[in-house]
Amino acid sequence: MEPERGRDSIMHIEQVSPARADVRDLIRLSDEHLAKLYPPESNHLESSDDLSRLNVLMLGAFNDGTLVGIGAVKILVEDVAYGEIKRVFVTPEFRGQGISKLIMAELERRLTENQIGISRLETGIAQPEAIGLYKGLGYVERSPFGAYQPDPLSMFMEKKISVL
């Protein structure tokens, strides 16, 4: 993705390995944040090893060379092919600058490049900023999908995206 100006710096997004130390650090920060909000049975987290599988694409958002955000999409096929958005997380000091929107746009672009026209996700009800982001991007509520079961602390969402 082309670099964008953010505050007084250059922001860019690129594919990253979940095995990178800085990516693992953000995954750990995300885990710690979510552990404060939800009990273990309501935390549907992908490990670094899970994110390293061939059907997963992980992106990193960099501000002047420093990783400040991550996001991933897992390609799945059930009744239809879709991408499941996972691990969208921005460090606290960089929130509110549109970085998560940039990550989501690039994840969706990568889905369309692969002829995947549906994007799905699970998020928690105690994350109003995330819910607002996803709704603002056109995601709508839906029933649980894949291996997910109904959970009063989870919200399941979907968006139809244009395929190239």
Predicted regions and their residues:
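Terminal substrate-recognition subdomain of acyl/acetyltransferases
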Residues: 2-6, 155-164
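Acetyl-CoA-dependent GNAT
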Residues: 11-86, 91-93, 104-106, 110, ...
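Conserved catalytic-core motifs of GNAT/GCN5-like acyltransferases
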Residues: 18, 42, 120-123, 131, ...
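Active-site acidic-Proline motif in GNAT/NAT acetyltransferases
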Residues: 91-93, 97, 125
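Short glycine-rich hinge loops at helix-strand junctions in the catalytic core
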Residues: 98, 115, 138
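Conserved GNAT acetyl-CoA-binding A-motif
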Residues: 104, 111-123
